[in-house]
Amino acid sequence: MKERMQKTLAEVKGCPQKDRTESEGYVGAQTFMWICEDNIVEVPFDKEHLLERIISPDNLLKAYKAVQRNKGCSGIDKMSCEQMLPWLLANKDALIRSLLDGSYRPNLVKRVEIPKDNGKMRLLGIPTVIDRLVQQAINQTLTPIYERQFSPRSYGFRPRRGCHDALRGAQKIIDDGYIYVVDLDLERFFDTVSHSKLIEILSRTIKDGRVISLIHKYLRSGVMNKGMFEASEEGTPQGGPLSPLLSNIMLNELDKELTSRGLPFVRYADDSMIFCKSKRAAKRVKESVTRFIEGKLHLKVNRDKTVVSYVQGVKYLGYSFYVMKGKCQLTVHPKAKSKMKAKLKELTSRSNGWGYAKRKQKLEEYIRGWVGYHHLANMKRFLMKTDEWLRRRLRMCIWKSWKRVKTRIANLIKCGIDKYQAYMWGNSRLGYWRIAGSYILCRAITNEKLSMAGYATLMGSYIEWHPK
C-alpha cells in the first residue's frame, strides 16, 4: 500500500514475544516502574535489549490502540488511522525487521501552523500514523523508566498528574512564604532543543544503542512545509507522541539543578515558576538560572518575558494567584475570562444559523469543560455576572429566531404578556440587544424557563464541583 516499509503493529499474531518475566534473567537488568491502569508495579528491564521490549506484540498492540483512540490527521503519506491496520497486517514482518536491523527510516513530518492568542503561530509537526505508532511504542516503554527520575514538582505530560496538581503545588509553596516568583519563559523551547545535548542525556539511561539511534532518526527526520523540505537540525516538533516525553527528559536537568539549590518551583512542560522569599533573591536566581539554561542546556531564555514579580496577578496555566489572610487563593486570570466570553459570544451569535438543540449542546459542552478546568478558582461573583450576560445573549437569539412581527406578538402572548404590550413590543424597532435586556423579554423568557429548556449555566456547573 505504501512503497516504503515502515513499522508494524501488533495485532500481529506471528511475532516472537518475550514474556515480561523472561527479562529477570538478563545480565545487567535493572528495575523500573511499569504504570498500569490500576497500579504501579516494578518490572525488570534489560538496558541492553530495550528495543525488543519496544517492538513486543503486547506493547505494539497497546500503541496501536492509543493511536486509534487519539485519531488525528494523516501525515505526508495521507494514510488515515482506518488504513493503518490493513497496512500493518500486510507489512508487520518487514516493519519489525527494519526496526531490528536499523534500516527503518521515519517519514518527513507535516508542518501545521496553529494560531496563538498573541497573534503568532504555534508550529506543530504531524508524523504519519505508522511513525506515530512506533513513537507511541517507544513512549510507553521509556515513560516508566524515566518516571522514577522525574521531579515530583514536574506535572506536565506525566501519568496521573496535571495542571490542577501544579496549581495546588504552587499554592503550598506560596503558603510557606515564598511570595516572589521568577516567571521563566523559554524562547521557542520545542523548536530549539539541542539534539546532541538531548542524545547525551538519553544515553545516560538508555544503553541500547539501537533505541538511541531510532530516537535520533525521529529528531532528524525533516519537515515538509507547504511542499518544501526543511532539515531538522534542532528541536522536538510538537505533535508526535514522543515529543512530550523528550521535553520532560531535557527539562528534568533543570529540575535537578533547582532541587540541588533548594529552590522551590513548579513546572508544567516548559512553563516554569521558581519561588523566593524576597525580590532581591528572586533577581539573583533569575540571573543564575538563565546562565545554567543557556550555558549547560543550550536553550534560549526569553529575557523580555522572564520576569521577577510578586505572586499577586501572575498568570499560570490560565489562573492567577492572590494572598488573603496569609493563604494563597486562586482566581481566573483576566485573559482567560476574556477568552471565555469571546467564545460564549461566538456560540450565541445571531448569525450562525444554529437551531435550539445544537446551541444548547454546544453551550453545555463548552461550559462544562471551562468550569471543569477552572473550578479551583474563587469565581462565584464573576460567574453570576457572566450568567446574566449569557442569558441576555440567549434571549437575543430567541427573539431573532421569531423573525416576523406576527410570530413575536403570538409568542409574547403565549409567554404571559398582555396583548397590548405584546403588540407594542412585537412592532418595536429597537435593536436585538436592547430588546433582549428589556423587562418585557425578561418577563416573557424568565431564568427558570431558560433552565427548564435545558440551557446550561456557569454557576450550575460550578455548583456541581462545589455542592456546599
Task: Put a short name on every predicted segment.
Residues 138:
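Nucleotide/phosphate-binding loop and acidic/charged catalytic motifs
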Residues 73, 83-108:
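Amphipathic alpha-helical blocks
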Residues 393, 398, 402-468:
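Extended C-terminal regions of large enzymes
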Residues 1-89:
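Non-catalytic, polymerase-adjacent accessory regions of viral genome-replication enzymes
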Residues 220, 296-368:
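A conserved non-catalytic segment of reverse transcriptases
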Residues 123-124, 128, 329-330:
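Conserved phosphate-binding loops in nucleotide/dinucleotide-binding enzymes
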Residues 328, 347-408:
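Right-hand nucleic-acid polymerase module
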